[in-house]
Regions:
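PP2C/PPM-type serine/threonine phosphatase catalytic domain
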Residues: 1-239
C-alpha cells in the first residue's frame, strides 16, 4: 500500500505555537503533541515529546501497542529530566502517535490530542480524551456534543511530564481507502466528526482534506484562539 500525508500547524491567536508535529509517510510514522501553555514552557515539552517519539518509532524494528506505550514512557522520562532546568519545572504536553506498517495500524495517545480513523469513508474510531469533560461524557453526565463546549474540557487527567504516565494504545487492520487524522484540541473543538467525514469524502488528497476542514475551522474560531495542528493521512493501493 501507498501512504501519503499532509501536515499543518498554526499559532492561531496566540503569540507563540506550543504544538509540535512530525511525519514520515514513507516510514508510516506520524506524531503530534500540544504543549500546555499554563505549565511553563509547553513548546519545549511538545518538541521534546515529538522528537523522542518520532526518532524511536522510525528506528524501531517492529512496533506493537506495548512497544509504543514504552516509547511514551521514555518520552515522559525525557521531559521529567528537562524539568530540572530553571523555568521548565511545570512543562507538560499531550501526544498522539500513529505507525502504519503493512496492513496494520498501531497508535497511542495521552491527553486530548486525537486520532480519528476512517475506513471506506466512515468513522471507524476516535481516541478517548483524557480529560475531566470526556470522563463526564463516558459517565453519562453530558452528551458527546457537550464535550466541545464544556467548561472542564481543558482540565486534563493524563499528560507527559508528570507521573504516573498512563498513555493508551490501540491497533487495527488497514486497507486501501482508509484515512487517519491526528490533531490537537485547538483544531477538533471547532470541526465536528460528521464534518470531518464529509470533507474526507470530497477530498482526493490529504492536503485537500485538510484544506476543506481548515475552511470550517477559520470561520468558527474566535479572536485569541488556541494553536491548532493536524496531520492527514491517506492509505491507497499501489499503482
Amino acid at each position: 500500500m501507498q501512504i501519503s500525508a499532509y501536515t499543518y500547524t498554526n499559532r492561531g491567536g496566540r503569540d507563540h505555537n506550543e504544538d509540535s508535529l512530525r511525519a514520515a509517510a514513507d516510514q508510516g510514522v506520524f506524531v503530534l503533541a500540544d504543549g500546555l501553555g499554563g505549565h511553563g514552557r509547553g513548546e519545549v515539552a511538545s518538541a521534546l515529546a515529538v522528537d523522542a517519539l518520532f526518532t524511536a518509532m522510525t528506528q524501531a524494528e517492529a512496533l506493537d501497542g506495548e512497544t509504543l506505550l514504552d516509547l511514551f514512557q521514555k518520552a515522559n522520562e525525557t521531559i521529567l529530566r528537562q524539568q530540572g532546568k530553571p523555568g521548565q519545572e511545570e512543562m507538560r504536553t499531550t501526544a498522539v502517535a500513529l505507525n502504519l506498517t503493512g496492513d496494520t495500524a498501531v497508535w497511542a495517545h495521552i491527553g486530548d490530542s486525537r486520532l480519528y480513523r476512517f475506513s471506506g469513508g466512515e468513522l471507524a474510531g476516535v481516541t478517548a480524551d483524557h480529560s475531566v469533560t470526556y470522563r463526564k461524557f463516558l459517565g453519562g453526565e453530558i452528551s458527546y456534543m457537550d464535550v466541545y463546549h464544556d467548561d472542564d474540557r481543558s482540565r486534563l487527567l493524563r499528560v507527559l511530564g508528570k507521573e504516573p504516565c498512563r498513555p493508551e494504545a490501540g491497533q487495527g487492520s488497514v486497507s486501501p481507502g482508509d484515512a487517519f487524522l491526528l490533531c490537537s484540541d485547538g483544531f477538533w473543538e471547532y470541526v465536528y466528526n460528521e464534518e470531518i467525514q464529509a470533507d474526507l469524502c470530497k477530498a482526493r488528497t490529504p492536503k485537500e482534506w485538510a484544506e476543506l476542514m481548515l475552511l470550517r475551522h477559520i470561520r468558527r474560531t474566535p479572536p485569541g484562539n488556541d494553536n491548532f495542528s493536524l496531520i492527514t493521512v491517506f492509505v491507497e493501493a499501489l499503482e
